[in-house]
Structure formats: structure tokens, C-alpha cells
Curated annotation (Swiss-Prot):
It is found in: Nucleus, Nucleolus; Chromosome, Centromere. According to PubMed:17256767, highly expressed in the thymus with lower levels in the placenta, small intestine, liver, skeletal muscle, and colon. According to PubMed:17823411, highly expressed in testis, and at a relatively lower level in thymus and bone marrow. Significantly overexpressed in many lung cancer samples, compared with normal lung. One of its GO terms (cellular component) is nucleolus. It comes from Homo sapiens (Human). This is Holliday junction recognition protein. There is a cross-link at residues 354, 581, 586 (Glycyl lysine isopeptide (Lys-Gly) (interchain with G-Cter in SUMO2)). The gene is HJURP. It comes from the Eukaryota.
Amino acid sequence: MLGTLRAMEGEDVEDDQLLQKLRASRRRFQRRMQRLIEKYNQPFEDTPVVQMATLTYETPQGLRIWGGRLIKERNEGEIQDSSMKPADRTDGSVQAAAWGPELPSHRTVLGADSKSGEVDATSDQEESVAWALAPAVPQSPLKNELRRKYLTQVDILLQGAEYFECAGNRAGRDVRVTPLPSLASPAVPAPGYCSRISRKSPGDPAKPASSPREWDPLHPSSTDMALVPRNDSLSLQETSSSSFLSSQPFEDDDICNVTISDLYAGMLHSMSRLLSTKPSSIISTKTFIMQNWNSRRRHRYKSRMNKTYCKGARRSQRSSKENFIPCSEPVKGTGALRDCKNVLDVSCRKTGLKLEKAFLEVNRPQIHKLDPSWKERKVTPSKYSSLIYFDSSATYNLDEENRFRTLKWLISPVKIVSRPTIRQGHGENRQREIEIRFDQLHREYCLSPRNQPRRMCLPDSWAMNMYRGGPASPGGLQGLETRRLSLPSSKAKAKSLSEAFENLGKRSLEAGRCLPKSDSSSSLPKTNPTHSATRPQQTSDLHVQGNSSGIFRKSVSPSKTLSVPDKEVPGHGRNRYDEIKEEFDKLHQKYCLKSPGQMTVPLCIGVSTDKASMEVRYQTEGFLGKLNPDPHFQGFQKLPSSPLGCRKSLLGSTAIEAPSSTCVARAITRDGTRDHQFPAKRPRLSEPQGSGRQGNSLGASDGVDNTVRPGDQGSSSQPNSEERGENTSYRMEEKSDFMLEKLETKSV
């Protein structure tokens, strides 16, 4: 028990020390605020002198409330007395601050403490200054009436939302509340005025506080007794919410005196409203609103606009018509801060919503001028001041939204044009249309004869291959395959190409077979010098004339001979082919008639017959497989062939190079065997062939023994053999070129 009592005594001592410190701090605050009032309660330049206590100033018409109407002066003497009291206060305020605490107490204690029931004498001493400075006001019904009319509210920002609702419903009605004692000391009012404690309970719903309109003496709310807290809690809310009710010997329509504590709450509320709506002060430029109101922010808040509402906006808008807050000098054509409808409530924290509100309010006159249908939709209803929230559901009115956006676009100087959105699937259809159009133009360009340059590579350019997803290299086989498969009739063309190559092989064999029959005297040791002398010239002539029509095919490797020739008009291409064929036939007949006995078949010397036939067969299969990548040729084994594959020495002379097609034709003509790809008849053994004699006269061991027998004249037959080999290669090359051109022209 003793320990408990000592603990309780220690706690009481600590509480007493804390209370003493708080009271001392409160007294210092009161003295400093009083000095500030005295310092700034004087005119600056030519501005009217406004009494901080009453918010009134003198005009030629009479005493006027700041931002309000003219006060009715029933008793002119009392008004003059009230105007003289601030001047008297200037002289005696410093003295009051000095000897105020020493004055005796003239005030009766309001009540007993709720806990101990003891009388708090300290509160009487702290309020002695107010009673000493207060004038002698007789106890009359006027005092109670003024108290009922002009009871003020302090620190509305710290109150809950229920106080606003109750304050709006009890305007003009009397609410009687039984006062409760408190240890909290009140603030000292301005010197020369009477004061009473006016406190409100922050947590009791049965004792609501008055609304902001009760600051206005023109809209009083009457209570018989002042409110004091029920407990001894000394929180910031209770300390800052202490206020006073000062009385003046005015009549009912006059105004009472107000202290700095009452003005502080109103000024704080006004400044908070101004700071929360800063864009409204620079909205005239219309640049700040457009920089912050972008599409990204609008869409982010739009999805929640049907659920998010500005807290307290309805109450502040409703009370703003009746409540006025001192803000600036009243000017004709300019209302007080309470009339500014382009400001938001302090509790609205969404920047995008603030900008939307300010934009709608400021530009409302322009919107009325631009679109008469704007009247159909009220932006800010008269009863509610909440913002217009757009619903993002499927039932949203698109016409109304489009009209609103059009108006915003017309009003704002910065035009923000939204990009047209492409629906899903529309882009794919558009891409398909572009691709079809591109293919059509490409075909038309290829069919046009004047727009066809001679191409030395594949029919499709590298750009076309890149467009179709093929390789970037112009000569790549993958691009050829891609282009070939992309054609509509690729299979039919592949089949026709296969048949054409078979026909080409047959004609090559037939052309090779007719040569030995005309070369019966090719192995004779004696030759005609006239023919020997004229043969080089004829060979060069044939070379030049043949190259005029087949130089394009000679310049391309065998792996690229599949390239489609220039696509021309069918009739023009057919006539050109017939002319070349007739010219070639004439030259061939003329050459055969001039030298009927000197035509010999150049052989691949130094290779055995069986080995040469096998090599020729595999080279032919590989070459044809490369030329026509058709499944018909995929079953055969392919060996890499080279244009220099038949590089052999002819009768001990220097080697010559011939294309693979020439070597194939010569080898098959010499050997006489027919391959399954070239169904040619085997020549008779009785026919004069150069193979038997050459087999006896020349060594067959890999071209090492190239000695000529004593009875042969190698010196004269060797150049003739070279010339005949060149003639045969050129002739077969021309045949192959013309057949390919004919085939490709048909395929086109």
C-alpha cells in the first residue's frame, strides 16, 4: 500500500510540473501575440484601417464589415466608442502585459473538476488580465444575446465530417449545453475587451461545433453557454482550439469583438484552400493545365472516376454561398474568397481532378459561346460541387464524351491530336493488301519489255528476297528456292523444266552422234593444208557469232543457269528465238559443208573408257540435280562437279577448259554408252571410230604416256584437234543456251 501511494504521489508531482510548464508556455505565447497585434494594427500607406478584432473599417458611408455590407448604426455613440478603443489599446497594452498577472481575480469559477471537485484557482489568475482590461459592461440582456449570436468556432480543420453535417442542420437554432470545468487556460484577448471561455468537445457527437458560417456575424448561431472539454487532456487540438467570445455594447444587428485566436483558424482555413488550388491563379494562360492534363493521366484516373469522389466537396460548395472569409479588399465586380467557385476543397488531393475542375470552371463562359448544347449537361450542379466523373463502362455515352473533348480541343491553344487506333486484325489485312499490290506491280514491271535490263543474276533482286524473308545475297540458292515456291504454278514449272532438260539431253546425244559419221577421215595422217589454214578463221567467226547470242549463258556458272531469262512479250520472244535458231542452223550447215572430212570428236585422253563413262554419268546427274531441284532428281547420288572437271590433255598438247555440258557431250559421244538419263542408241562397231586407234596409239595410264606412234603426224593433227574441240564445245554450248531460252520462254 505504501508503494502504491508513493507511486501515485510521484505521478501527481509529475503531472503538476507538466501543467506548470504548459501554462508558462501559454502565457509567453499570449504576450507575443499581443505585441504582434499592436505592431500591425496601424494603417499602411493609404489603405483603410481594418480593426483586427471586429474586421471593420471606416468608410464615408459608415462602418463597414470587411468584404460585407454596411453595418446599421442604431447607436452612433457606441460605434464611436468602439472606434476609439483600439487607439487606447495601443497605449495601455504594454503596461497590461507587464502588470497583468499581478491583478486580483474578479472572475468566478465556472465549475468543479470532474475528477476531484476541487476549485482551480490557477485558471482565475491566468484570466485576470482579461477582466482587468475589460470595460465595465453592465449585466444586461444584450450580453447574453450577443453571446448567443456570435459564438465562434475554432480550428475547423481538426474536426471530423460529422460537425459539418450538424452545423448545416442547426443554423438559427439554439443548442443548450451544460458547461464542464477545465484545467486548460484560455488565451488572452485584445486589451479593452471582455472575454469568455468558448471551447468545444471534439469527440462528443451530442455537442456539435458550429459551422464556418458562424464566423459571420450576419449569420449567427445561438447558444446559451460556452463549451468546455470534459477531460484534462492537453492535446494540440484542444490547445489550438481555445477561443474567446468578446462582447461589445452593440445592439442585435451590430458586430462583436473577435480575438486573434478566432481569426487564426479562419486564416489557416483560407490559406489552405488557396494553396490547394494553386493552378486556379494561373489558369488564364492555359499552359499549365495542358502540360499536366495529358492522356496518360486522364486514362489512369478515368477508370476510377465513377468510384472516387472529392471528400467534403458537397458541403464546402453548399456553405460557400453563405459563408464569407476575409481575404482581400472588396472591389466592385470582384467577390470575396467565398464566392470563388473555381477552388476546390482542402481535402481534395488528386491533382488531375483539381485541374479538371479548374479547367471547367474557368472556361465555362467560352464553352457557352462555342457550344449551345453545353447547357444540357451541368458541370457543377447548384446543390453539389463534386466533379463530373466519367464512367468507363460499356454504357458510357460516347457522343457526350466526344463533344466534351472537342470543346476542350477548341478552347486550348495547344492542340493535342490523338493518333487513330488500329483495331486488331485490321493491320494484318492492310499488310496483306500491300503484299498483294507489291506482287502485282512486280509482275507488271517484269512483263513490260522496256523496263527489263539484262540481268546477270537470279530473277529476283536482293530487295525482293529481303521482302519475302529470303537471304540478302543476290546469288543465294535459298532465295531462288523461296521465290520458286512462292509462285502459284511452281510445281507445274518444275515438271516442265524436268521434261525440257530430258529433251535437251536427247538432242545433245543426237548432235553428238551425227559428228562421227561425218568424221570418217579424221584419223588420216594427211590433211588438206587449205582446210587447216582456214579452220582457225572459221572457228573464230563461229565463236564471235555464237557469243552474240549465248554470251549471257557463258558468263553464268552452271549452278545459276536456272535463272529465268528476260520476260518479254510472248510473241516478241518467240520471233526472236526463231531468228536465232535459223541463223544458227545456217551457220552449222555451212560449216559442215565446208569441212566434211575434218570433223573429229575431241576425246578426253588419258582416262579409261569405263572410268570416263562413270565420271560423265555422275557429273551429269549432279549438274542436272543442281539445275532442277525437283523431287524427280533427288533419288540419284550427286557428286560435286566443276566447270573444269574435264580438264585433260589432247594429244600431248596444252590443256583447254570446257564447260561441264561440253565434256558430257564429248564423253558420251566417244564412249558410246548411254545413260539412263540420256536414252541414246549404241553406235555400231563397224562405224569408223577414233577410240580404237587412239587406244592402240596412245597410252591409257592416266595420261602419262602421250607419245604419238611413228606413222601418225602429230604436228599437223594436234592443232586441228584443238580447233575441232573448241568448235564442238561452242556448238554444244549454243545448243544448250537456245534450248534453255526456249524452255524458259515457254514457262513464262
